Amino acid sequence: MAQHQVNYASAAGLPIALTSVDKLVNWGRSNSLWPLTYGLACCAIEMMASGASRYDFDRMGTIFRASPRQADVMILAGTLSKKHSEFARRLYDQMTEPKWVISMGSCANTGGMFNTYATVQGVDRIIPVDIYLPGCAPRPETLQYALMMLQKKIRRESANMNNNTKQNLRLV
C-alpha cells in the first residue's frame, strides 16, 4: 500500500489548522475583554465614567470585573506609589493567562508631575504594559480607542504567545 506524505503547512510554515484555530481563539478573546477595575487617582473617575450609561462599554463586550481571577485586562489608572506597587503586582499575578495591561494617564505612564521617592516612575517598571494611554486625565473616548487598539493587537498575535514576546503600543 502506497503511503503519501501530505503537507498541511501554509506558506509561512505553520500548520493551516492551527492558524485557523488561532484566528478563532483570538477573535473570541478580543471581543470579550474583561478589565480589572483598578483606579488609583483622577484617571479612575474617567474609567468609571466609561462604564456608565453614556459610554456603556458593556455593549462592546467589555465588562468591568472586581476580581483579578475573572479579569484578563488590567487598567492601571493614576499614580502608583512604591508601597502600592507590591499590591498591583500581586493582582497582576493572580490574573489568568493571557492577560494584558493598559497604563492609563501620564501619572501611570511616567509618574506624571510626582517626581518623588515614593512614586513609581512608570508602571512598566513593575508590570509589563501592552498599551500606554497618554493624557491627564484621558477621556472615556480615549480609553475606548485604547481598548479597540488592544482588540486589534490580540487578533494579530498567536494564541500561544507569552508576555515576553509581546510588543508595546503607544497611543499618541
Curated annotation (Swiss-Prot):
Q: Which GO terms describe its biological process?
A: aerobic respiration; electron transport coupled proton transport
User: Which residues does the record give as [4Fe-4S] cluster binding sites?
Assistant: C42, C43, C107, C136
EC main group: translocase
Could you tell me which Gene3D superfamilies the record lists for this protein? 3.40.50.12280
Kindly give the Pfam families that the UniProt entry links to this protein: Oxidored_q6 (PF01058)
What start and end residues bound the annotated signal peptide? Answer: none
What are the UniProt keywords, alphabetically? 4Fe-4S, Cell inner membrane, Cell membrane, Iron, Iron-sulfur, Membrane, Metal-binding, NAD, Quinone, Translocase, Transport, Ubiquinone
Q: What is its EC number?
A: 7.1.1.-
Give the protein's cofactors. [4Fe-4S] cluster
The protein's role, per its UniProt record: NDH-1 shuttles electrons from NADH, via FMN and iron-sulfur (Fe-S) centers, to quinones in the respiratory chain. The immediate electron acceptor for the enzyme in this species is believed to be ubiquinone. Couples the redox reaction to proton translocation (for every two electrons transferred, four hydrogen ions are translocated across the cytoplasmic membrane), and thus conserves the redox energy in a proton gradient.
- Name recorded for this polypeptide: NADH-quinone oxidoreductase subunit B
Q: Which gene encodes it?
A: nuoB
